């Protein structure tokens, strides 16, 4: 007898082949049978008539490194059909750590990934020093989602080199040898890869760039050679230029990545986004990735399935946050509804619009966001509820201002304070230069590009892209109206088999016999994203943006139902996923 059988559904099996009517049977946490009709009884049966059945989604770009130590649901990813997450990206993580340097790693993560430091300080248990000890601590965790991690270069460099590493001083041959040894040790203990950041905008709360940002080639190759030594692992990075800065070096990055991958015979995956300064640079990099394959390299650009940018509202960073009248009203009105009502008063509006910003706090890395947003209002869009991530030009704040005969700053003010004040506007920084998704469609369609950059668990106060797996289905396979859609089978494969295969997780990602029973049953016709909300549910009352979905009828991990109609069941089959051992 099977443990569970899913009948009556349309199987989109993750291989990219055409969807078909079929059944899936599960036994002992594995897929035991798949076919048009599977004979045999089951202890439990799910009627999936009118639903699609997919593999669980594998999200390879998250930052749950701290959250996984206290949260057993791993929201928001768990609510979007994700059954496996990979963390430790962008060169930041929490192991190895020198005793007494825990808070330094926290302020590094807070600065780079906008995760409240107070939440990390209260939530992380710090049961480790070395990376293998970190994995052993994680192995004790039982969650609703499987999780794997990479070794972060930033933490490793600071551990080996101390203050010299933290301050980005050059590594000596002995430093490199030790980092190589510890990287090999981490891979052999189960790390899925090693990650680094070379992005100038990735900075700790103390203003210092991530350790390794300026690492010389011999240091980077030392990390890569450790992967070759261990015979496993992925080299992941946020390359120079990925944030729109340092674009000269962005073109050089591909050369060393190509050389490294061919030399170590391991995949290299890196963030790739379209930027406004050189809007065709991404295509040059993608073409280089194709050419690299002919030279024995494995380069896989990680791409975002929608515009990559900020969510702006009264509860996040916005242009008025440092204006005296706004600050006073925010102190007097503790609820967002009361604050919005006060801001709707014409006298208060006039006062705020007439004021200058107070000086930014030099000790707060994010306090200057108000100024940045104010000069980028031409990129700000009203996206509505439910959110439309491909808004037409007339929905930009600039266009609304022109139509109403006011300045953009006033149009932005009116949009922020409307209703109950919880509105979120979108400010795309990348992937929306032309005001549509055609570039993104080209990226997703490319065989070497990997779906990623959701940043689940990170950018808590500004970005909310952990819902991308759902968006891939609703927008690209069903709802897009301003251009061509993508086949459902392709969209599912992009975030199941393709992502799992990149990180060597070949036991999952498809609905095939013997594979891990990670499955979604989805009401595809009614699948939708809800509006983005700000909640204070992290340790110490830390805030984060959440976006829930409707339409996931069942999410199954290792054969156990973890979500039913979007609600957590309490099942905790999720475990640490170790790589080569």
Where are these regions (language model features)?
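Histidine-rich, glycine-flanked metal-binding segment
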Residues: 1-5, 11-56, 532
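Divalent metal-coordination and catalytic microenvironments
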Residues: 9, 29, 50, 61, ...
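Acidic, glycine-enriched loop/beta-strand segments at the rims
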Residues: 11-23, 425-434, 440, 487-490, ...
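Short, ordered loop/turn segments at secondary-structure junctions
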Residues: 36, 90-92, 199, 240, ...
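Divalent-metal coordination cores built from histidine and acidic residues
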Residues: 70-193, 229-230
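Active-site neighborhoods of metal-dependent hydrolases
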Residues: 134-138, 144, 150-160, 167-173, ...
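C-terminal cap of metal-dependent C-N hydrolases
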Residues: 364-365, 438, 442-449, 454-455, ...
């Amino acid at each position: 007898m099977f443990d569970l059988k899913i009948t009556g559904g349309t199987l989109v099996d993750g291989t990219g082949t055409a969807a078909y009517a079929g059944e899936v049977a599960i036994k002992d946490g594995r897929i035991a049978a798949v076919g048009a009709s599977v004979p045999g009884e089951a202890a439990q049966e799910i009627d999936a008539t009118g639903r699609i059945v997919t593999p669980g989604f594998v999200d390879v770009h998250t930052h749950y490194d701290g959250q996984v130590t206290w949260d057993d649901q791993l929201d928001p990813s768990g609510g979007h059909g994700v059954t496996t997450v990979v963390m430790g990206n962008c060169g930041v993580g929490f192991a190895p750590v020198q005793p007494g340097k825990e808070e330094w790693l926290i302020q590094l993560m807070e600065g780079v990934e906008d995760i409240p430091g107070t939440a990390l300080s209260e939530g992380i248990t710090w049961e480790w020093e070395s990376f293998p000890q970190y994995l052993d601590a994680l192995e004790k965790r039982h969650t609703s989602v499987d999780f794997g991690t990479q070794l972060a270069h930033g933490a490793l460099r600071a551990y080996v080199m101390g203050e010299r590493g933290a301050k980005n001083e050059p590594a000596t041959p002995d430093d490199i040898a030790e980092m190589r040894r510890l990287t090999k040790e981490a891979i052999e203990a189960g790390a899925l890869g090693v990650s680094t950041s070379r992005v100038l905008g990735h900075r700790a709360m103390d203003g210092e760039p991530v350790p390794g940002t300026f690492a010389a080639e011999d240091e980077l190759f030392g990390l890569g050679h450790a992967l070759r030594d261990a015979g496993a692992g992925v080299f992941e990075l946020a390359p120079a230029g990925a944030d729109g800065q340092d674009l000269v070096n962005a073109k050089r990055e591909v050369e060393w990545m190509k050389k490294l991958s061919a030399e170590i015979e391991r995949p290299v995956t890196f963030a790739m986004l379209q930027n406004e300064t050189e809007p065709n640079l991404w295509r040059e990099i993608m073409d280089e990735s194709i050419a690299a394959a002919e030279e024995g390299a494995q380069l896989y650009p990680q791409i975002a399935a929608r515009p990559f940018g900020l969510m702006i509202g009264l509860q996040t960073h916005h242009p008025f946050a440092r204006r005296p009248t706004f600050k006073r009203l925010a102190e007097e009105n503790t609820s967002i509804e009361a604050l919005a009502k006060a801001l709707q008063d014409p006298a208060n509006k006039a006062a705020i619009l007439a004021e200058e910003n107070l000086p930014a706090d030099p000790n707060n890395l994010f306090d200057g966001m108000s100024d940045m947003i104010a000069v980028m209002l031409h990129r700000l869009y009203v996206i509505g509820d439910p959110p439309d991530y491909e808004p037409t030009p007339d929905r930009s704040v600039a266009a609304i201002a022109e139509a109403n005969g006011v300045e953009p700053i006033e149009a932005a003010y009116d949009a922020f304070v409307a209703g109950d004040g919880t509105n979120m506007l979108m400010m795309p920084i990348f992937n929306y230069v032309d005001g549509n998704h055609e570039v993104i469609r080209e990226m997703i369609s490319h065989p070497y590009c990997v779906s990623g950059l959701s940043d689940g668990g990170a950018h808590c106060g500004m970005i909310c892209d952990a819902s991308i797996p759902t968006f891939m289905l609703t927008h690209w396979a069903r709802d897009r109206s301003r251009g061509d859609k993508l086949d459902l089978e392709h969209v599912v494969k992009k975030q199941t088999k393709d992502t799992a295969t990149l990180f060597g997780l070949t036991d999952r990602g498809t609905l095939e016999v013997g594979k891990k029973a990670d499955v979604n049953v989805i009401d595809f016709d009614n699948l939708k994203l809800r509006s983005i909300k700000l909640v204070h549910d992290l340790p110490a009352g830390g805030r984060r943006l959440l976006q829930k979905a409707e339409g996931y009828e069942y999410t199954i991990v290792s054969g156990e139902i973890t979500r039913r109609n979007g609600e957590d069941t309490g099942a905790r089959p999720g475990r640490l996923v170790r790589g080569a051992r």
